[in-house]
Amino acid sequence: MNPLIVSPRSPRTIIAFALSALLLGGCATFSNDGGFNTVTQITQDRAGKTVKAIRSDDDAASVQSSIKARLAKPLDAGDAVQIALLNNRGLQATYAELGIAEADLVQAGRLHNPGFTFRRTRQGDDVLIERTFTMNLISLITAPLAQKIEGRRFEQVKLLVANEALRVAAETRRAYFDAIAGGQGVDYARQVNLAAEAGADLAHQMGRSGNWSALEQAREQAFYAEATAGVARAMKASVMAREKLTRLMGLWGDDIHFQLPERLPELPAQPLELDNAESMALQNRLDIQAGKLETAGLASSLGLTKTTRFVNVLDLGYIHNNQTGLPPERGYELSIEIPLFDWGGARVTKAEAIYMQSLHRLAETAVNARSDVRESYLGYRTAYDLARHYRDNIVPLRKKISDENLLRYNGMLISVFELLADAREQVASVNGYFDALKDYWIAETDLQAALGGKLPDNNSVMKGQ
């Protein structure tokens, strides 16, 4: 490569230009919060809870102190969610994505390191010294656009991290209600088992006295055996639900012995009315907002690819050569890649395909969000109506039937076995209400997630729940 020699003034201009570029490139620094303030604000606004990235022993001690204070009393759903947001290790790993994205942003704002070449050769008594200082001009020209692309990427990661925090919060709420319902399921199974045991004992005694057939005895014994198996199944389901909640909260050791309320929260007085659920979802969902940022970033990347389609390598160098007996040789050299075989068409086509792929995925996300919120709202209203139906109709009717049967039993109009069977049916109706109540709270959580993590102000969500 032959250097092009210019007047002594031009190299000074080149050096000044290079130093200015380096100074500007060095201005790219890390933010004080590492992007975490956005995640904190979104989580506080939509879930009413705080988040904290554990980066030091002091942070870990502060988090543990907060967790211990909440574990000292029976947990409500809000406590469980707060513990998960602070202590879930998978979520803490997600928080680290902010640091990775910001590092990429800062790196995009910094120029490539310049190169310096020194060469000394001797030919007889003659000494030739060559000095070359080079810079990558392409990185200088494209740095603003690259930084803009990474800036959008950083904003996208903020939304994705906040969305993951809201997902963990929703999953913890579901697990919380499942865990309480699991405990109630064990209580119901034990009540049924006690009634079945009483019926089996009575049938055995009456059979021994000849007042009960072997067939009837076998039926009562079979029901008792099935009820005993039901207790085992209920206990297993309860342990699994509680362990899922434990994992989401990131608890271990003595902390796993946390206390839960014995009963689920009662049904709200009125359900939530939504007339614009789809528009709310499209406006508030973080996955849609992140998808828009991704698409905008890819559009910028496509522009960058087209900009560097023909010229991908462009180096500018300042030359200072000294040779014995000759005046110094100064100038600059320009190194450029010749697009002889690769005209950049493949890279542009690939960038265009990736951009179109992002557009279609964003459209898919929007379509799925509309469907998700419609389905969630239907499930929410159905769950509310079903729970209210159990509370206002089925349970009162079963109680009335039980009261009437007790009067008939006292009047010797029905047998004790009929009374026990009626008691089992009444317990089943109450348990059905508890199941419907659990389904309602989970359905409300699903609706909240489908709307972007927050229900309207006139919602039926219990504060603290």
In which residue ranges do the predicted regions lie?
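Periplasmic alpha-helical coiled-coil/stalk elements that build and connect Gram-negative outer-membrane
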Residues: N2, A28, A143, L159-M280, ...
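Terminal intrinsically disordered/low-complexity segments used for targeting and assembly
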Residues: N2-L86, M235-M280, Q448-Q465
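A small-residue-enriched
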Residues: C27-K49, Q82-S139, R242-L251, N276-A346, ...
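Amphipathic alpha-helical coiled-coil scaffold segments and their short linker/junction regions
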Residues: R70, A80-N87, I149, W212, ...
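Short, charged, amphipathic alpha-helical segments
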Residues: Y95, K148-G151, A214-F223, V416-R424
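Short segments within alpha-helical structural elements
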Residues: E197, E226-G253, R361, A369, ...
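C-terminal structural cap/anchor segments
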Residues: R347-H389
